[in-house]
Amino acid sequence: MYAVAIVLAALVALGATVIGTRAARNGRSATSKPPPKTKKREAVPRTPLPQEVRGVHVTMALASLPGKLDHYLSIPGLTALELDVKDENGEVGFLMPATSLARKVGASKPYYRARAVAAKARAKGVYLIGRVVVFEDPMLTASRPDLAIQTGGGAVWRNNAGLGWANPYDKRVWDYVLSAAKAAARAGFDEIQFDYVRFPSDGPIESAVFPGKTAEAPAWTIARFVHYATTQLKPLGVRVSLDVFGLSATRDLGVGQKPGRLAKYVDALSPMVYPSHYNPGEFDLTDPSASPGRTVAFSLRDFNNALLGRKAVLIPWLEDFSLTSDRRPPEEVQAQIDAARRSNARGFLLWNPSGVYTEELLK
């Protein structure tokens, strides 16, 4: 026993690990220094969700113009601003790392500096939402047709506007989209809002080929993407929301959007209840566009029913534009806002493709 003790003592002196000691259980020698602690990333400051969201949408191109973003952030009464992070052209509004796929396919553009924009919005007390277009992506599909919805001959399938769409069944597409969303979250955006989170709604859909397609219903594929996206983004401290079609609350539009199912995973749902987009006779209205307040009220009634028991709040997109004239009269925009408020929405977001808004209605 005395000899064994001498051997053990010698081994310990030489720095060997003795079985049964704490050092052995930790996988290091008794005399080695403890491994350095992993430095935690400092939490990114966030602006809380406003009591009433009163917001507008801004394109990345507009944000690149001198003084334009400052103007939007200074609109009296504005509490939220949605800025394109990844748009329907497939462009990402800021520079991603040089090794990223977005840079390799030419999608990453220096329209704005994400951290600087987030800091500016935070200083103004404005809640910053990053819009991320998901599956419509002509830029990615042009460079990577293997990630696209395809034709029978293997070419990139295109919708009626001639735009390619990424394949919703391909997880590589999911991760590509989320790379931009995560970058915006880390830069300080308060919320990521997914748009075009669906299958195509127009074009020669009957000829579309989806590599890797399963027997799973499209609505479950979209739900799986949304669930996956939230598990990736929530640890970064951002809220997550979705844009959905205005009629998706009561109808299967064939694009995979089921609001009641999707609302299980996100913080907010933003239905696009644009009165000009409803056909005559919808909600028993001869001309829904001519009755904007009633159209929004009927639409949000259906969404409130679809979201019963869900945690997601309702923040609709309203129409501050017109398909038949340059501008929609202010009283018609106000009628939509009033309808949203009566429907117990958590606020509203105004959409105008040209970025010109009826600013006095945000007060």
Functional labels for PLM-detected ranges:
Residues F94-V105, D137-N160, D202-K213:
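Aromatic- and acidic-residue-enriched segments that line the glycan-binding/catalytic groove
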Residues V56-A61, Y127-D137, Q193-F194, P200, ...:
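Aromatic-lined carbohydrate-recognition surfaces of secreted/lumenal glycan-active proteins
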Residues A80-E82, G106, Y112-W157, Q193-F194:
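Glycine-rich, aromatic-flanked loop segments that form ligand/cofactor-binding clefts
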Residues R54-L62, P97-Y111, A161-D175, G212-W220, ...:
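The substrate-binding groove and active-site-proximal loops of carbohydrate-active enzymes
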Residues P48-A63, A119, F135-R186:
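Active-site-adjacent "subsite" loops/lids of carbohydrate-active enzymes
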Residues L62-P76, A102-G125, A219-H227, F298:
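Aromatic- and glycine-enriched glycan-recognition loops and surfaces
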